[in-house]
Design a protein with these regions (language model features):
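Internal alpha-helical scaffold of NAD(P)-dependent oxidoreductase catalytic cores
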Residues: 31, 135, 156-187, 193-224
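Conserved beta-strand segments of alpha/beta enzyme cores
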Residues: 34, 72-74, 116, 138, ...
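NAD(P)+-binding Rossmann beta1-loop-alpha1 motif at the extreme N-terminus of oxidoreductases
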Residues: 1-55, 62
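Rossmann-fold NAD(P)-binding glycine/threonine-rich loop
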Residues: 102-153, 158-171
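Amphipathic alpha-helical segments at domain termini/boundaries
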Residues: 12, 26, 30, 69-88, ...
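Hydrophobic/aromatic beta-strand patches that form the interior of the parallel beta-sheet core
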Residues: 36, 90, 140-142, 182
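Rossmann-like NAD(P)-binding element
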Residues: 40-47, 58-116, 124-125
């Protein structure tokens, strides 16, 4: 369990179980959370199990929560069923608008209004992803760096409809489980981390506040 200011997070739904999603699942397990994983691939369950087993030795070296266990997860092929009972949802489906928009629409209908849905997307516009969600205010980008179970940096980006409370909850949750969340200004933009040279040039020309944030990025081990 992770206790935040306003809520407690016990169960996380990880929707999309490729490299990023499976790595997220391992990381959440290492911090004592119950995890439900969903992915449509026929061999997804076995791949997730192998990924968690492979990641666990490194997570042990980094330090496990007292309640951590590599066995506290279950698999549901249907994303709506996987989301049932979740206190936080981390979506990591393929980077295609048609896939993510439909998936997020389904998750938005399945989850209670107060549950934050964070997308791992790095290159899609958050405001476009929100277009078909009834509760768009609870949708945010929570973009990890690869692999998420090792690299601590997470970029948090809100869309035009994202509520401030959603940003606060996502930032607090990531921080509580050992991540280093960095917030980008709410906009229709994508994340900046994978485009460091272009982003740094722009950030440094935009004023002192952005310069300070930009300097923090390399400290969290930007990948090549």
């Amino acid at each position: 369990m992770v206790k935040l200011t306003e809520i407690e997070i016990r169960r996380v739904a990880v929707i999309g179980a490729g490299t990023i999603g499976a790595s997220w699942a391992a990381y959440f397990l290492a911090h004592g959370l119950d995890v439900t994983v969903s992915d449509p691939a026929p061999d997804a369950r076995d791949k997730v199990a192998r990924h968690i087993d492979g990641a666990w030795p490194a997570l042990e070296k980094l330090g496990l929560a007292p309640e951590a266990s590599p066995d506290r997860w279950r698999f549901q092929a249907d994303p709506s069923a996987a989301a049932d009972g979740a206190d936080f949802c981390q979506e990591s489906a393929p980077e295609r608008y048609e896939i993510k928009i439909e998936l997020l629409r389904r998750l938005d209908r399945a989850l209670p209004r107060e549950v934050v849905i964070a997308s791992s997307s790095s290159g899609l516009l958050i405001s476009r992803l929100q277009e078909h969600c009834n509760y768009a205010e609870r949708l945010v980008i929570g973009h990890p760096f690869n692999p998420p179970h090792i690299v601590p940096l997470v970029e948090v980006v809100g869309g035009f409809k994202t509520a401030q409370a959603t940003i606060v909850t996502a930032m607090e949750f990531y921080r509580a489980i050992g991540k280093h969340p960095r917030r980008d200004a709410p906009s229709g933009s994508t994340t900046v981390g994978w485009r460091p040279l272009r982003a740094w040039c722009w950030q440094f020309s935009a004023g002192s506040d952005r310069r300070r944030r930009c300097r923090r990025l390399p400290r969290c081990r930007l990948p090549p």
